[in-house]
Amino acid sequence: MSNHVIIKGKNDRLVIALDPNIDFLDICDILKTKILEAKDFIGNSRMAIEFSGRALTNEEENKLIGIITDNSDIVVSYIFSKRAESEEENIDLNSLNPLIEEGKTHFFRGTLRSGSKIESDGNVVVLGDVNPSSMIRARGNVIVLGHLNGTVCAGLGGDDRAFIAAIYFNPIQITIGMKTITDIQDEILDSTRVDKKSKFKVASIKNQEIVVEELI
């Protein structure tokens, strides 16, 4: 049983290796047992979850995340996994390539907490969440691989070719070049409510206005 589900820590994430050759319901039972056994050791932690070894559908992934959150004090900030072939999304990044210039990219791993700020002369990529009252200012593009609840300024200096993108797109305010939009936040997105159906959204300037579109 111990070899069918293996849990180990890796930097900022919990890696869960799954046996691809046993029934998924057995995986669920074993994972629940192991999470309960490790609950006190893991404690109240905010971390990403990485599933490896087995391709998962959205439904299976959500089921496993539910088992983890229901049986531990883990707050899931992001999910890494291999998608089942039938569930793969064809995301066309070529449409963004003309907007990406060569230059410096600032990578930030973790949660940008309220009151914190990132400033960069190039692009910014956040591997985590951007909390309310936090700010990102970049001369290039800004990509958030998590929940965007803060304020983002891209294309500082008037570059209207820049873009802002996030998996969970809910900023307080965004500025691209010289254009700004506010009042676009309906609620604070909570990373404990994992919705794998959320679409990756991109804000860019079209016809002199900021437009937010789903990237599908």
Swiss-Prot record:
Keywords: Cell cycle, Cell division, Septation
Domain of life per record: Bacteria
Keyword Cell cycle found: yes
Entries under InterPro entries matching the protein: CAP/MinC_C, MinC, MinC_C_sf, MinC_N_1, Septum_form_inhib_MinC_C
Pfam families cross-referenced by the UniProt entry: MinC_C, MinC_N_1
GO biological process terms held by the UniProt record: cell morphogenesis; division septum assembly; regulation of cell septum assembly
Subunit-structure text: Interacts with MinD and FtsZ.
Family (UniProt): Belongs to the MinC family.
Known function: Cell division inhibitor that blocks the formation of polar Z ring septums. Rapidly oscillates between the poles of the cell to destabilize FtsZ filaments that have formed before they mature into polar Z rings. Prevents FtsZ polymerization.
Protein name, UniProt field: Probable septum site-determining protein MinC
Lineage, uppermost ranks: Bacteria, Fusobacteriati, Fusobacteriota, Fusobacteriia, Fusobacteriales
